[in-house]
Amino acid sequence: MVPVGPERGANSLFSLRFTTFAVGTVSLPLFAFLFCIVWSLLFNFSETTATHCHVPNYLPSVSAAIGGETPQRYIWRLCIGLHSAPRFLVGVAYLHYYQGTPCSSPAYPRLCHLNFLLNCCEIFFLILLTYVSSSENYEVHKLGFMAFMLFSVGYMFVTCSLWRVARKGSGSLEERTSYAWKKRLFGFYLLMFLSSILVYIWHNMYCEAGVYTVFALLEYLVVLSNMGFHMTAWWDFGNKELMICSPGDKRI
């Protein structure tokens, strides 16, 4: 990556603002998620809102919406597949971004690598729960979902810790804005996730009408806050370009 500037070099073959690349990558699962929810409500309402105890429910769970019926399953898998490789590239970019930030803490370099590892694990288990739906193999899908949530929480926590340790209130306006939104979205994500667990337990214990609808809505907020957290890359890479150059140009 190089800073955005008027000169791109004679050997530059392709360039793209990294903000466009990073946010566009996250937009793929966002589109797929919204499509699956809307399509399920319009065309597969009864199939995707059914509950094990047959109480009234008005929203499909995330698993039912993305993996229960077609074409939702195909759209979700296509978008997740397309966004996966770029997500790993964004992870590498973040690793270099954090490593390039001066910090006197002896634990900082290890936190950078831990953050990258957690990010890779999050992406891997997202792929697993995507391509093994709950209707195909419930146990594997459940494992993928639980691991995805665990690594997502870990990644967000370590990311916020890196910013707190390295920045300590300093940095540009964009960096301070990014850090502020990261903290808000992580807190909201954690609150919605814990709330969804409590509501899910309540549903399984008492099977009351509408409770599973609340659970599904909380799931949606968990997913959207996760995507929002990753979209803070808009501020982190605002002055960078992704460039592909011929061998004569050493910039990448």
UniProtKB/Swiss-Prot annotation:
The lineage of its organism: Eukaryota, Metazoa, Chordata, Craniata, Vertebrata. It is found in: Golgi apparatus membrane. PANTHER family: FGF RECEPTOR ACTIVATING PROTEIN 1 (PTHR12892), POST-GPI ATTACHMENT TO PROTEINS FACTOR 2 (PTHR12892:SF11). One of its GO terms (biological process) is GPI anchor biosynthetic process. Residues 44-77, 133-142, 206-208 are lumenal. Its EC number is 2.3.-.-. This is Acyltransferase PGAP2. It comes from the Eukaryota. It is an enzyme of class 2 (transferase). Keywords: Golgi apparatus, GPI-anchor biosynthesis, Membrane, Transferase, Transmembrane, Transmembrane helix. The gene is pgap2. It comes from Xenopus tropicalis (Western clawed frog). The chain crosses the membrane at residues 23-43, 78-98, 112-132, 143-163, 185-205, 209-229.
